[in-house]
Swiss-Prot record:
Disulfide bonds: none annotated. Its main location: secreted. This is Cuticle collagen 1. Changing residue 288 to V: In e2809, e2889 and e2896; abnormal left-twisted body.
C-alpha cells in the first residue's frame, strides 16, 4: 500500500514537472517573436528620429551659413541737401532697391500633433512621513486566565486493524540436501550417426565369361526433367520512332547580347525660337564742326 502511494506521488511529481517544462518552453516560444518585433520597431523608430534630427541640424546650419554669406556690409545712407525751390537737383540720390531681401511670409498652418513622448524618469524619493499617533489598544492582546483542566474521559473504542507491514528481509540460504536414489533408466535414444567407411576388402576371383547374345533395346525410360533456360537471344531491331511529345517548359532568358552598332545620325532639328533682343548699344556720332562726340541719348562726353 505504501509503495503504491509513493509510486502515485512520484508519477504526479514527474507529470507536473514535465507539464511545467512544456508550459515554460511554449511561453518562451510565444514571447520571443513578440519581444523581437517590439525591439525592431523601437530600433526603426529611433533610427527615423535620429535621421530627422540630423536633417534638421543640417538645414539649420545651411540657413545660418546662407545668412552669413548674404549679410554684407550695410551701405551708408546718402543724405543729400535739400533742393532749392524752383532750381534743378544738383546730386540726385540713386534709386537703391533691395532685390536680394524679402520679408517673411505669414506663418504656415499648424502641423500634425507629434508622437507621445517617452515616460519620464522616476522622481526622487519623498521625505519621511510624520510619526503616527500612539495606539489606543495594547500591542499584545491580553489573554484571559486558562480554565481548569477537565478530568480524563473514558477510553475510546479500539481502532480498525492496521495495514500489513512491509515484507521482511530475505532469509539465509539453507543447507544443500542429500543425494537422491538413482532413478529408472530412461527411454531408448535415437540412433547415432553413421560410422566411417571401412577399408576395401580383397579382390575376388574372376567370374565365368557371359554367354554372347544379341543386344535387345530396352523399353524407353521416363522423360527427364526440363533443362535450364537457354542464353538470351540477340537484341531485336530498333522500333519505330514514337509521336513527338508535348513542348517543354519555357527556358530561362539567355544572357544579354553584345551592344549593337550605333545607328545613323538623325536629320538636323528645326531652328529654335528667336531669342530676346539684346541691350541697346551705344553708337557715338562725330560732329565735324567742333570735333565733339555725341551719343544717341543726346548727351555730350
Amino acid at each position: 500500500m505504501e509503495t503504491d502511494g509513493r509510486l502515485k506521488a512520484y508519477k504526479f511529481v514527474a507529470y507536473a514537472a514535465v507539464g511545467f517544462s512544456i508550459a515554460a518552453v511554449a511561453s518562451v516560444l510565444l514571447t520571443l517573436p513578440m519581444v523581437y518585433s517590439y525591439v525592431s520597431h523601437v530600433r526603426q523608430q529611433m533610427h527615423h528620429e535620429i535621421n530627422f534630427c540630423k536633417g534638421s541640424a543640417k538645414d539649420i546650419f545651411a540657413e545660418v551659413n546662407y545668412m552669413k554669406a548674404n549679410a554684407g556690409p550695410v551701405p551708408p545712407r546718402n543724405r543729400t541737401t535739400r533742393q532749392a525751390y524752383g532750381g534743378p537737383e544738383v546730386n540726385p540720390a540713386p534709386n537703391l532697391q533691395c532685390e536680394g531681401c524679402c520679408l517673411p511670409g505669414p506663418p504656415g498652418p499648424a502641423g500634425a500633433p507629434g508622437k507621445p513622448g517617452k515616460p519620464g524618469r522616476p522622481g526622487a524619493p519623498g521625505t519621511p512621513g510624520t510619526p503616527g499617533k500612539p495606539p489606543v489598544a495594547p500591542c499584545e492582546p491580553t489573554t484571559p486566565p486558562p480554565c481548569k483542566p477537565c478530568p480524563q474521559g473514558p477510553p475510546g473504542p479500539p481502532g480498525p486493524p492496521g495495514a500489513p507491514g512491509d515484507p521482511g528481509e530475505a532469509g539465509t540460504p539453507g543447507r544443500p540436501g542429500t543425494d537422491a536414489a538413482p532413478g529408472s533408466p530412461g527411454p531408448r535414444g535415437p540412433p547415432g550417426p553413421a560410422g566411417e567407411a571401412g577399408a576395401p576388402g580383397p579382390a575376388g576371383e574372376p567370374g565365368t565369361p557371359a554367354i554372347s547374345e544379341p543386344l535387345t533395346p530396352g523399353a524407353p525410360g521416363e522423360p527427364g526433367d526440363s533443362g535450364p533456360p537457354g542464353p538470351p537471344g540477340p537484341p531485336g531491331a530498333p522500333g519505330n520512332d514514337g509521336p513527338p511529345g508535348p513542348p517543354g517548359p519555357k527556358g530561362a532568358p539567355g544572357p544579354d547580347g553584345p551592344p549593337g552598332v550605333d545607328g545613323q545620325s538623325g536629320p538636323p532639328g528645326p531652328p529654335g525660337p528667336a531669342g530676346t533682343p539684346g541691350e541697346k548699344g551705344i553708337c557715338p556720332k562725330y560732329c565735324a564742326l567742333d570735333g565733339g562726340v555725341f551719343f544717341e541719348d543726346g548727351t555730350r562726353r
